[in-house]
């Protein structure tokens, strides 16, 4: 969840449960590519396993961000196709992608081919 599941929240959740899989808040691909929120990629090594949740629909951007995420040590990459926010949907990601299953499939295929993590 945006503005909630930051590294401090995830660290607290890890203290509460060693078994849950943790995810970042949704991070827009454009924000990562243009360096606006690279600090959101940071996590504490005690958070593992931890996945990153990307928001985007441009295949090349998603591939680039997937590679960045793998290099940072994430265990998994998740593509957000559920955020109902109007602001997010104006950027053509989130829940509006449910209407474009072929695009989602192409995005996921290219992301999978680019990295070795799920």
Language model feature labels by segment:
Residues 41-51, 94-118:
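Alpha-helix-loop-beta-strand connector modules within alpha/beta enzyme cores
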Residues 26, 30-32, 81-101:
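Glycine-rich, proline-tolerant flexible connector loops at the mouths of alpha/beta enzymes
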Residues 70, 77-78, 90:
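A structural preference for short, pocket-lining loop segments at secondary-structure junctions
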Residues 3-72:
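Glycine-rich, positively charged N-terminal anion/phosphate-binding segment
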Residues 18, 73, 113-117:
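Short glycine/proline-enriched coil/turn segments at helix->beta-strand junctions
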Residues 9, 64, 81-83, 109, ...:
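Low-complexity, compositionally biased segments
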């Amino acid at each position: 969840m945006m503005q909630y599941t930051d590294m401090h929240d995830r660290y607290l959740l890890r203290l509460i449960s060693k078994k849950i899989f943790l995810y970042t808040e949704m991070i827009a691909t454009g924000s990562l590519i243009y360096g606006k929120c690279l600090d959101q990629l940071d996590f504490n090594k005690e958070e593992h396993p931890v996945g990153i949740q990307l928001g985007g629909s441009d295949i090349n951007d998603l591939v680039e961000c997937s590679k960045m995420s793998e290099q940072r040590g994430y265990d998994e990459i998740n593509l957000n196709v559920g955020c109902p926010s109007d602001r997010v949907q104006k950027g053509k990601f989130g829940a509006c992608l449910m209407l474009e299953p072929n695009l989602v499939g192409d995005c996921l295929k290219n992301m999978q081919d680019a990295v070795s993590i799920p």
